[in-house]
Amino acid sequence: MTPEHLPTEQYEAQLAEKVARLQSMMAPFSGLVPEVFRSPVSHYRMRAEFRLWHDGDDLYHIMFDQQTKSRIRVDTFPAASQLINTLMKAMIAGVRDNHALRHKLFQIDYLTTLSNQAVVSLLYHKKLDEEWREAATALRDALRAQGLNVHLIGRATKTKIELDQDYIDERLPVAGKEMIYRQVENSFTQPNAAMNIQMLEWALEVTKDSKGDLLELYCGNGNFSLALARNFNRVLATEIAKPSVAAAQYNIAANHIDNVQIIRMAAEEFTQAMNGVREFNRLQGIDLKRYQCETIFVDPPRSGLDSETEKMVQAYPRILYISCNPETLCKNLETLSQTHTVSRLALFDQFPYTHHMECGVLLTAR
């Protein structure tokens, strides 16, 4: 695979290899055949980052070969959304001959939605001044005149200039209901929107007969918490990043959801609070004992769950675990399988044509 060519004819074969690999990895814990969720074969990534290469008068996006580290010119990127591809051409055309915008520009980041909104961030090795703001405003207005719903941001050391806003609002159809998700520039969002919809619908399906409340660790902008709220009496969720917490609070209001509570704290801190080890001012006014959480949802970073969180989640009758790294999932399962069995297993092809796998497991207490 190269940035400008996707081996779409190999999609089914690479997916079958992932299914076999996941099934083999999970064999010590489950004999289940994974439920498989396919990605679109192209235009599936909703965000992308590119370095910029200045070559005389020419200017273009580049990526680096992971093996050789050599640079690769990228004029089109079929893995990314159609909107990103349109913006890539428009940004180069708008920046190439404008000194204020081009000088010391080294990277452009694109974030888009299925609702055809975009935030484009321009990263510089220089101080951004009023001349830059005026030039960027003119570029933004020209892009909008082309029918592009885009917001521009300038970034430099200790500097961030928003011409109007640093977020976009995604709208996803999830099991018959439209969900609104505010996505903030430079914060985590699910890269493959079509796959995100399938993950949300799978999580809804496997928790449809739930009793009691849901606890979620690492909730981000509320992606899973808000979709799952319809299956539970109440949802209590934690997140450490301030922009994500703010986006989650907006999303709660935008989706008219009244049974989700977001707490800004790390999963490790929440574990300490639940175990009575420490008290936190952020939990004032929240009676943790009031929640009857029968299900816990975790979507941890690639490092998986730490040992203390492993012990904490074992106290719940059901554990819903979304993993972006099956190796650390299996490491966690060495502990979790002592008290729980794997009752559902899914493979989500979040990153086609790569070795990366996203998977989900539902664990029920023995």
Swiss-Prot record:
The active site is at residues 324, 358. It comes from the Bacteria. GO terms for biological process: tRNA methylation. The keyword Metal-binding does not apply. CDD domains: AdoMet_MTases. Its EC number is 2.1.1.-, 2.1.1.35. Pfam families: tRNA_U5-meth_tr. S-adenosyl-L-methionine binds at residues 190, 218, 223, 239, 299. Induction: Growth rate-dependent regulation of transcription. Is a novel example of a mRNA regulated through a mechanism similar to that of a stable RNA (rRNA). GO terms for molecular function: rRNA binding; tRNA (uracil(54)-C5)-methyltransferase activity, S-adenosyl methionine-dependent; tRNA binding. InterPro entries: MeTrfase_TrmA_AS (IPR030390), MeTrfase_TrmA_CS (IPR030391), SAM-dependent_MTases_sf (IPR029063), TrmA_MeTrfase (IPR011869), U5_MeTrfase_fam (IPR010280). Keywords: Methyltransferase, S-adenosyl-L-methionine, Transferase, tRNA processing. Belongs to the class I-like SAM-binding methyltransferase superfamily. RNA M5U methyltransferase family. TrmA subfamily. Catalyzes the formation of 5-methyl-uridine at position 54 (m5U54) in all tRNAs. HAMAP family: RNA_methyltr_TrmA. This is tRNA/tmRNA (uracil-C(5))-methyltransferase. The lineage of its organism: Bacteria, Pseudomonadati, Pseudomonadota, Gammaproteobacteria, Enterobacterales.
